[in-house]
């Protein structure tokens, strides 16, 4: 973990932050002021997770912004369709690593009730990602999210159900990319281009996806 001065020496110019800045490695705008303070350095995407946002719930919603031609399943596969939703929570493992848990809330219990300890023991939320802390400054943990954003994952993009309905096979990494990451006061908006091989050797399908992370 490096100090704040070392972080600045790595090229993070705080003075260029602006509320309307888009993080996009193809443009000159590489910093964004807003939720998670996303920025891009040498082609890598980074987020800063403040102490105050640990153990808070985040709602993820992924929609098709622009749909692939010729790949429909009755009423599915159109622009505007919601293809994933989930609830997440960042958690500190230690000073060198953060966990991301996917929250499954099928059961409830009163925190003041006698059954609550048993409820907690029967509802351990799954750890779906572990991020190394690259720097810590101003009570914020800097993590590299590049591989996560670029991956073929149902944590951010098409759910397993949606992939099955649309007959999507593996992601074509060389034909997929992160287009932009935009930060606001309570949410982060991620735009990506994703290309998939269709099951059964039926060709390729390219989608523009819009993923939102909203702090609840």
What are these model-derived regions, one by one?
Residues 5-216:
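Auxiliary tRNA-acceptor-end handling modules of aminoacyl-tRNA synthetases
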């Amino acid at each position: 973990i490096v100090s704040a001065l070392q972080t600045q020496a790595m090229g993070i110019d705080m003075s260029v932050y602006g509320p309307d800045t888009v993080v996009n490695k193809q443009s000159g705008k590489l910093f964004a002021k807003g939720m998670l303070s996303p920025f891009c350095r040498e082609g890598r995407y980074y987020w800063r997770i403040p102490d105050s946002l640990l153990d808070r719930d985040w709602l993820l919603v992924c929609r098709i912004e622009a749909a692939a031609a010729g790949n429909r399943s009755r009423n599915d596969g159109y622009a505007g369709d919601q293809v994933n939703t989930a609830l997440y929570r960042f958690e500190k493992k230690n000073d060198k690593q953060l966990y991301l848990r996917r929250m499954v809330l099928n059961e409830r219990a009163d925190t003041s009730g006698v059954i609550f300890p048993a409820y907690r023991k029967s509802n351990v939320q799954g750890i779906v990602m572990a991020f190394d802390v690259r720097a810590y400054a101003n009570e914020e943990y800097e993590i590299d999210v590049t591989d996560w954003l670029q991956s073929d994952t149902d944590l951010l993009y098409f759910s397993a159900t949606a992939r099955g309905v649309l007959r999507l096979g593996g992601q074509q990494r060389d034909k997929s990319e992160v287009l932009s990451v935009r930060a606001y006061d309570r949410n982060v908006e991620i735009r990506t281009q994703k290309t998939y091989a269709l099951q059964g050797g039926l060709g390729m399908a390219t989608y523009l996806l819009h993923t939102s992370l909203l702090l609840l």
